[in-house]
C-alpha cells in the first residue's frame, strides 16, 4: 500500500536551471539536470519495496514533480514494472522529464513488443498516448 509520508522523504532536487545573461533570455537554452545518483538510488529502493505496479506508478508520478531523469534512470524504473501497459503508463509521466532523449534506445529496450516500443518512442517524442 502506498503511504504518502514516504514522499516527504523523497528528495525534490533543485533542477539547476540556468538562464543566459543579457536583456533577453531565450527559454530554449534552459537546461535541467537529472536526479543525482544517491537520490535516484533512494527512489529506486522505494520503488523496489512496493508490491504492486499501480503503486510504483503512483510513486513515479510523484517523483516526476520537480525532478528530471536520464534515459538510463528511466529505463531502470520501467524495468521494475511487470507489463508493457504499465511501462507505457509510467512513461507518460517520465517522458517529459527525460533529459537525454537521444539515448532513448535504452528505454525502448524495456518494451517487449514492437508496437509498444513504437508507442513509447511517440511518447518520448512528445506525442500523447491514445
Segments (PLM) and residue ranges:
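General marker for long, soluble alpha-helical cores
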Residues: 2-130
Amino acid at each position: 500500500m502506498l503511504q504518502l509520508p514516504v514522499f516527504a522523504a523523497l528528495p525534490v532536487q533543485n533542477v539547476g536551471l540556468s538562464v543566459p545573461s543579457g536583456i533577453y533570455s531565450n527559454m530554449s537554452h534552459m537546461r535541467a539536470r537529472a536526479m543525482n545518483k544517491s537520490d535516484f538510488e533512494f527512489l529506486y529502493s522505494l520503488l523496489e519495496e512496493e508490491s504492486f505496479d499501480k503503486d510504483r506508478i503512483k510513486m513515479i508520478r510523484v517523483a516526476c514533480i520537480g525532478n528530471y531523469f536520464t534515459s538510463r534512470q528511466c529505463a531502470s524504473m520501467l524495468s521494475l514494472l511487470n507489463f508493457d501497459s504499465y511501462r507505457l503508463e509510467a512513461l507518460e509521466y517520465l517522458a517529459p522529464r527525460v533529459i537525454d532523449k537521444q539515448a532513448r534506445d535504452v528505454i525502448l529496450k524495456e518494451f517487449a513488443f514492437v508496437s509498444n516500443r513504437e508507442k513509447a518512442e511517440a511518447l518520448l517524442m512528445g506525442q500523447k498516448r491514445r
